């Protein structure tokens, strides 16, 4: 999680530098409430110090943003989460960057909007100190949130309500890492404040014109550390130490709109922890060790479909794919990717992402750099 925190710091610096160029600002406060769920169900089902299910979660948010042209905004926010079980889980505080924009205008004062948040959450109680907490093993965890909202606008006031989903986890850097999800509703009120500086666009020296119908290509290299698991005689063991995950994604895009791209990606991946179970050593009493798998069981080549929302400074990408060249059960099945690209220059970007398997199992972080080739 140290690498993720460093990456978040760089993203916050990029946002802070661009804030100085904007003339309109936005202050907001909101509440979120919903149903918490996790693949590891014991804590939420009532095996905790309270002796009752944890079936309600709530959060309060405060945000500062600068307003971009064309009804969009981005900035920095804080969120405080409660599962109403501070003893076992803690009351974590999240620091995040966010971006929102209009999807459709319904009338002069009503619209459908979206907003995403990405950051880090601090203050979780760790599993080794609080054994009832079977969902989190680190005090700092990633925070990802997305919302679709019905918004009412006046000259300087905005009120929004809509469905909301949140995910917390440590990127499989420690175990347990079941993570926590929350689905529910949010209510936000925002006020627009006029600034004193002239309005300019962030990175306006490199912003592209509308390239609808054009082609581009992103090449991303990434690496991260993760924990490995071993199944032996129907028991699950956590392998000692950490393992490397790395790769290169070669991703051509077709630009449907200057703010939306679709494409395919050739995903070349290396996972040092893959297929450890096939090389486990033990006896009737349990696991005693393992042999490192051969390289051919640790590398894979896959194809994935990608969709990307492109905004000033940031791009948010979603992908779903399947390995086509691989060996071993751990590299089979579908994988999913969600990633945030922070554009440093016209072509260079920071890549901060997360890969899942089969829509539910955390796999590893995708921390790296990428280069965009335009007009291919």
PLM regions: where:
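Bacterial Sec-dependent N-terminal signal peptides
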Residues: 1-29, 110, 152, 157, ...
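Short glycine/proline- and aromatic-enriched beta-strand/turn motifs that initiate or cap beta-hairpins
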Residues: 23-66, 200-251, 372-376
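Residues that define the transmembrane beta-barrel architecture of outer-membrane proteins
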Residues: 25, 54-60, 89-95, 110, ...
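Transmembrane beta-strands of outer-membrane beta-barrel proteins
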Residues: 25-29, 72-76, 112-118, 159-161, ...
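Repeated loop/turn-to-beta-strand initiation elements of outer-membrane beta-barrel proteins
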Residues: 25-27, 37, 69, 107, ...
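Outer-membrane beta-barrel "beta-signal"
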Residues: 36, 181-202, 362-376
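Residues on the lipid-exposed face of transmembrane beta-strands in outer-membrane beta-barrel proteins
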Residues: 60-66, 95-103, 116-120, 144-152, ...
């Amino acid at each position: 999680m140290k690498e993720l925190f460093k990456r978040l710091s760089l993203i916050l610096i990029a946002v802070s530098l661009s804030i100085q160029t904007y003339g309109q600002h936005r202050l907001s406060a909101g509440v979120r409430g919903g149903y918490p769920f996790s693949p590891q169900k014991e804590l939420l089902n009532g095996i905790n110090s309270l002796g009752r299910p944890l079936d309600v979660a709530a959060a309060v948010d405060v945000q500062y943003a600068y307003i971009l042209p064309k009804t969009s905004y981005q900035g920095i926010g804080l969120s405080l989460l409660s599962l109403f079980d501070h003893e076992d889980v803690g009351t974590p505080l999240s620091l995040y960057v966010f971006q929102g924009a209009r999807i459709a205008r319904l009338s002069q004062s009503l619209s459908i909007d979206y907003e995403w948040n990405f950051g880090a959450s601090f203050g979780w109680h760790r599993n080794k100190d609080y054994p009832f907490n079977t969902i989190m093993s680190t005090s700092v965890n990633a925070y990802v949130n997305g919302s679709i909202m019905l918004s009412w606008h006046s000259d300087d006031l905005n009120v929004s309500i809509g469905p909301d989903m949140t995910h917390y986890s440590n990127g499989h850097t420690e175990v347990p890492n079941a993570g926590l999800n929350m689905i529910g509703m949010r209510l936000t009120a925002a006020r627009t404040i006029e600034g004193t500086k002239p309005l300019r666009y962030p990175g306006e020296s490199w912003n592209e014109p509308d390239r609808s119908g054009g082609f581009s290509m992103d090449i991303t290299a990434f690496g991260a550390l993760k924990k490995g698991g071993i199944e032996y005689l129907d028991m699950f063991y956590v392998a000692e130490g950490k393992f490397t995950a790395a790769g290169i994604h070669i991703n051509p895009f077709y630009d449907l709109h200057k703010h939306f791209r679709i494409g395919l990606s050739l995903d070349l991946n290396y996972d040092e922890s893959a297929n450890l179970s096939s090389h486990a050593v033990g006896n009737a009493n349990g696991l005693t060790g393992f042999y490192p798998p051969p390289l051919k069981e640790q590398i894979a080549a896959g194809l994935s479909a990608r969709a990307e929302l492109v905004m000033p400074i940031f791009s948010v990408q979603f992908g779903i794919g399947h390995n086509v060249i691989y060996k071993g059960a751990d590299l089979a099945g579908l994988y999913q990717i969600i990633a945030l690209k922070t554009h440093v220059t016209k072509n260079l970007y920071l890549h901060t992402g997360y890969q899942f398997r089969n829509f539910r199992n955390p796999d590893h972080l995708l921390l790296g750099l990428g280069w965009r080739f335009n007009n291919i």
